[in-house]
């Protein structure tokens, strides 16, 4: 790995990229070997975008450079640079098969980045960022946003929808990881990714990934039927909203919990058949049954 900057910025460069070796080791340990022979990071002034990625090379804005006394800027810089490195695996070496699979490539790259940042900053920081992202998705996905995957649409996603796709996709993959992990086989999404990257080493034909093939590999590795999950979270739009209430039943000496689910996106399109066909809002998300529990006696 090599990093380049303009003269006079060497000290900030060393501080900014000091963690990249740990990121490379993490990705290679969990997601197979690095797919290229080298990696260069170039900090450029007045770059039109914050970052531009290509094979073995990432152009990054000098605004991300920081000294050892920086606090808030550290997370943004490490998020951007670790994501740039993850894109070498998913996004550059392995690409989407169709435009409708863009959510998967972008989401997997961000999911890999999130796992590394969880190790780097700790589980509390990771869950805090996850919670904030969930709140933003819930506020946005109320009927105006399309599904993150539209297989029958050959056109690329609208530019205004891409930030939302990049926000929701890693959260959907996080839910999928939890679903696979609770299947009883102790198989999570990292193992599925490792298998995907391992198959990509065989030949160029395996360097294009589709939503269908990804779900097929997940089902093959874990044995979990993901059709309902895919229809709700991938091919459908909207997010569930839950309301809970609790009542103490004196006769049964138990707390009875009732749960009510609402889907704002479905309510938004309920009276418009045409928009329901386009946006595919989910009327009801699958949930697990909650059972009452007996309180502990106190003496």
Regions found by a protein language model. Name each.
Residues 164-167, 284-291:
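Short, compositionally biased segments
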Residues 145, 263, 280-282, 294:
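Intrinsic-disorder/low-complexity coil detector
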Residues 290-299:
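Solvent-exposed beta-strand/loop surfaces of large extracellular or lumenal domains
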Residues 267-287:
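Short coil-to-beta strand junction motifs in C2/discoidin
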Residues 3-270:
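Hydrophobic alpha-helical and helix-loop surface patches within well-folded domains
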């Amino acid at each position: 790995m090599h990093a380049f900057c303009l003269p006079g910025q060497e000290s900030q460069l060393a501080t900014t990229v000091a963690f990249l070796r740990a990121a490379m080791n993490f990705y290679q340990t969990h997601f197979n070997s690095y797919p290229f022979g080298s990696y260069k990071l170039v900090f450029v002034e007045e770059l039109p975008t914050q970052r531009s990625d290509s094979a073995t090379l990432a152009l990054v804005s000098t605004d991300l450079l920081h000294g050892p006394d920086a606090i808030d800027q550290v997370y943004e810089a490490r998020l951007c640079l670790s994501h740039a490195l993850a894109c070498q695996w998913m996004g550059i070496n392995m690409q989407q098969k169709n435009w409708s699979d863009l959510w998967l490539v972008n989401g997997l790259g961000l999911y890999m980045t999130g796992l590394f940042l969880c190790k780097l900053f700790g589980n509390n920081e990771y869950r805090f960022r996850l919670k904030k992202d969930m709140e933003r998705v819930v506020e946005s996905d109320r009927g105006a946003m399309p599904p993150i995957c539209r297989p029958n649409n050959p056109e690329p996603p609208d530019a205004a929808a891409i930030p939302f796709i990049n926000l929701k996709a890693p959260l959907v993959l996080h839910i999928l990881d939890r679903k696979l992990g609770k299947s009883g086989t102790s198989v999570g999404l990292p193992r599925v990714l490792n298998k995907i990257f391992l198959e990509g080493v065989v030949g160029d034909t395996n360097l294009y990934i589709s939503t269908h093939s990804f779900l097929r590999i997940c089902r093959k590795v874990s044995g979990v039927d993901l059709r309902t999950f895919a229809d709700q979270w991938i091919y459908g739009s909207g997010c569930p909203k839950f309301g809970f209430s609790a009542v103490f039943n004196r006769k049964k000496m138990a707390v009875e919990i009732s749960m009510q689910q609402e889907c704002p996106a479905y309510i938004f399109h309920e009276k418009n058949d045409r928009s329901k066909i386009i946006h595919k809002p989910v009327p009801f998300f699958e949930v697990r049954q909650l059972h009452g529990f007996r309180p502990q006696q106190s003496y």
